[in-house]
Amino acid sequence: MKKLILILSVTFALSVSASDIDLETFGQRYFATMVATQDPNATEVDLDNHLLLLADDVGHSHLPWVIDDSRLPDGKEAMREGMLFYLGTHTEYSAELLDVFTFNTSAVAIRYKKSAKGIHPQSKQAIAYTQTIMEVLEMEEGKVAVIRKYHE
């Protein structure tokens, strides 16, 4: 399954332009690759498959923790480093895509519910949570340029 997601992600990332992108399909693909990064058995390959969908200078906010969504030249690399820190944190993870909203060719929003259990890599404390999240993905040239993440 992971190889299929990789092949689809690479094919999709290389074959679309801003004018012919199907944002609903893109939102579903983004969700699938994101979920793969949270799996207890996720690997760096899963991270890279997800990161293929992002612009190199991607900006990211995750309120209330990360409020600066500035686009920086190393945005994707910084995101990869953050994702590596949390890689393998979960012992259990599930997510359900609830909605996909499209906004002409400029943005797509996904709303999903996720549940996770695991051990926080820094505090070494057990974590368990269920959240409903909305991510607004601002698009540029067929890639995610800015991610804005909100909790319900």
Segments (PLM) and residue ranges:
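Sec-dependent N-terminal signal peptides
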Residues: 4-13
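A solvent-exposed, acidic/Ser-Thr-rich amphipathic alpha-helical stretch
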Residues: 21-23, 48-103
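Short, surface-exposed coil-to-beta transition loops
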Residues: 93-96, 128-134
